[in-house]
Amino acid sequence: MQDPNKLRPFFENVEFNREGSNMILNFGPQHPSAHGQLKLVLEVDGEKIIKARPGIGYMHRGVEKMAENMIYQEFVPVTDRVDYIAAGSNNYGFCATVEKLCGIDVPRRAQIIRTMLLELNRIASHLLFLGTHALDIGAMTVFLYTFREREYVLDLIEKYSGARLTHHNVKIGGMFVDLPDGWLDELLAFCEKFPRDIADYEALLDTNRIWLLRTQNVGVITKEQALSCGCSGVMLRASGYKWDIRKEEPYLIYDELDFDVPYAEAGDCYARYKCYVQEMRESVKILTQCVPLYKASEPKILADSPEFVSAGKEQLMSQNYSLMQHFVLITQGLKPPEGEIYLATESPKGELGFYIYSVGESSPYRLKIRCPSFWHCAIYEEIMPGQYIADVTAIIGSSNIILGEVDR
């Protein structure tokens, strides 16, 4: 039998039992349900998991170190590749942190556009979660339905930014362009149709006996476990702790919007699925409320901060000083004041935070990204023992991790 203890010092503090009938099973990193390059070393007794240890790092790209060698504007598209399923959330989180450090006041219309794009990102991310999670367990029909609606959402994002996955649609100080003609009408048409689609997903799953058996009372996370392991987002709310940064520490225009924070008490895979589904309904409510606010706003999408933000194209073409300032910002980069700052936002997967330590140069001295998937991956060691091997895919799927976030 293989000697799992040869994995040391990779698993420095773990001793796997070689006595008796226990077996060591390697899950991933090429498993189709691993949601990236996740590896799990499982000690199993028959079908029961005795010990689980996640192995990460297969997608490490040194994103935080890259930031130290780029000007702030250059790093924005790199954030697309952290959580590449909801790239706009990363764009906004980084830009908002730099804006707060520099004291940049973003115009209201830009804030409304950002809010709409963030909620579309949330829906697209949740649809991918629901479709792949159902497919992992064997429900193929839901996968086909969710990807049908996700195409509509990606088309809306593409019509604004020109890209479907890595958007780079937010810039430091505002937005690149205003919404195109007809975009709001297409958004409202989607918001009118989408709640019926969500009801179809629930009709397919909530009456499916196999789905209920595979998700209820599986992968239970208690409130205490969720808090001690640093869980956030749905992973925390589904365990009975109602915490959403959009409500508790509002940013953009979330304090003006009427929406609920779904949560559950059970803490199992089914509770997490229900929270994700209900969150999509709340995102539709937010998008619907944003439309009249956008129409009533002043058509201004860039901040008046020439020290940090380039002027609009018309101004660049007509004012010599603006063109010179633009040249300096592009070639040398903006230079925030000295200091350090941490800013957290509610990404589709949980608390996404950016910490920047600035020494007054055009690149951060240190950048740290607090990604929710990293903490959610760490909890597997707590909740997988006692579960069956077949439940591993259900637990991983319901935690909705992205390995680009875990490894960075």
From Swiss-Prot:
Summary of the function given for this chain in its UniProt record: NDH-1 shuttles electrons from NADH, via FMN and iron-sulfur (Fe-S) centers, to quinones in the respiratory chain. The immediate electron acceptor for the enzyme in this species is believed to be ubiquinone. Couples the redox reaction to proton translocation (for every two electrons transferred, four hydrogen ions are translocated across the cytoplasmic membrane), and thus conserves the redox energy in a proton gradient.
Domain of life of the organism encoding this protein: Bacteria
Family the UniProt entry places it in: Belongs to the complex I 49 kDa subunit family.
InterPro entries: NADH_Q_OxRdtase_suD, NDH1_su_D/H, NiFe-Hase_large
Pfam families: Complex1_49kDa
UniProt GO cellular component terms: plasma membrane
EC primary class: translocase
Name of this chain's protein: NADH-quinone oxidoreductase subunit D
Species this chain originates from: Campylobacter hominis (strain ATCC BAA-381 / DSM 21671 / CCUG 45161 / LMG 19568 / NCTC 13146 / CH001A)
Subunit structure: NDH-1 is composed of 14 different subunits. Subunits NuoB, C, D, E, F, and G constitute the peripheral sector of the complex.
UniProt EC number: 7.1.1.-
